[in-house]
Structure formats: C-alpha cells, structure tokens
Amino acid sequence: MTTYRRMTLCDTLQFNFVNLDQLTETYNTSFYGEYVTHWPEYQRMCVHPTTNIPMAYTLGKAEGQGEDYHGHVSAVSVAPTFRRVALGETLMAELAQMSELVHNAYFVDLFVRKSNQVAQDMYHRLGYIVYRTVLNYYHGDGPKGPFKSDEDALDMRLALRRDKERRKSSVIPLDRPIKPEELEWV
C-alpha cells in the first residue's frame, strides 16, 4: 500500500534515500522550490502509509507555446527498496493525466540517458516513443565518477489527445540527432 500526495518543499529535505541511484538527476533546493511553487500540481510523492518514508517522486512542469505546449518530466525517481512495484509508472501516468486534463497539453516529453535501458523500457510500456537523440546532453563526471564521459539523451514523447489538432504530430521522430543548443526549451 502506498500514499500518493502532492510534494511540498519540506519533502526535499527527506527524499535523499530516493535519490541514491546514480541515474537520478538531483538538483539544488532553489530548483525544487521553483517547481513546487510554479507547478505544484505536477510535483507528486509516494510515501509509505505507516512510516511516511518517501518511496518515489516526480518533478514536472508545463512549458512551450502554441502547438508546442506540453508537459515535461524533469525527474522521476523510485527508492531502490521500492522498485519493481509500478510506483514510477503510476506517477508517470498521473503526470500525463495532469498534462492532458488540467493543462490541455499536446504531449509529454522527457530526457533519459541512452544507457538507461530500464527507464526506456518503462517509458515504452507507457506509450512513449523516441522522438530524437540529443548529443552529449549529459555531462560526464570525469575519470573518478560513475559517468566518465558525456552521454547522449533520448528525447522521448507521449502524444496526448490534443496532438491530433497539430499541423504535424509531436511524435513523428526526427531523422537526425541534434545538439543541446538546438533544443527549443532550455
């Protein structure tokens, strides 16, 4: 059993256990604060119902303009102890639903390391497609870090109902990789 609820800024002081994975992107307090205050409906937590221990969370936002208005997943992370029980999938479904029903977005997008096959498999199960590759999107940690060199990201997208209204679908893959400076939303 799990309790799903809106994230608060105080939660950021308690979810280090969720962020232990080297594949989880972590941010500074002001970044989390910006998300919690500007897009509170997108910030979701899973906590253990009896211990209140953070189990998983998502960070998201609405961005873009016109036909590029979309939901964006900045982070989804599940604590190692609580993996393989669909917490990430449930949070991702909530984020897509929020993007569609509250924000009337055209699609949801996210970036994932090319080497993170487990996450890619989950996103594919949820209906996401690889829209494009962003070359050297993730910066390496150097010789002593877990990621020695820069790594490409896959920009994955999930079309929402409103995508049918676009002149060109948001999920037709690009035929070439791009550089980070070519991204529309920075």
Curated annotation (Swiss-Prot):
InterPro entries: Acyl_CoA_acyltransferase, GNAT_dom, NatB_acetyltransferase_subunit. GO terms for molecular function: protein-N-terminal amino-acid acetyltransferase activity. Residues 2-161 form the N-acetyltransferase domain. Pfam families: Acetyltransf_1. Its EC number is 2.3.1.-. It comes from the Eukaryota. GO terms for cellular component: NatB complex. Gene3D superfamilies: 3.40.630.30. The keyword DNA damage does not apply. The keyword Transferase applies. Keywords: Acyltransferase, Transferase. Belongs to the acetyltransferase family. ARD1 subfamily. Seems to be involved in N-acetylation. This is N-terminal acetyltransferase complex ARD1 subunit homolog.
